[in-house]
Amino acid sequence: MSEQRSVSVIGLGRVGLPLALCFADRGLRVLGVDHDHGVLDSVRSGRMPFMEAGTQGLLERVQRSGRLELSDRAADAARADDIVITIGTPSFS
């Protein structure tokens, strides 16, 4: 990615996307990875794919900063210094 510290977040759901946005807002270069092209298209167009208080403004700010990159390829995550995996887990209830 660059000389600036970077992190990849795999899974841009209700945990991963807000986390990725917070990392980017704090100055990290972030690669967000998700297999769902609907999610990626929504984020690229500046729209949150779900309702979460405060995240729409955060997404807009992060997009202006240029610190968020998106990919549908999990292998791209290896370019970052650190990787966080936030994928759904099954419910046993």
Question: What is each model feature region?
Answer:
Residues 1-93:
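Structural/interface elements that position substrates and couple domains in central-metabolism enzymes
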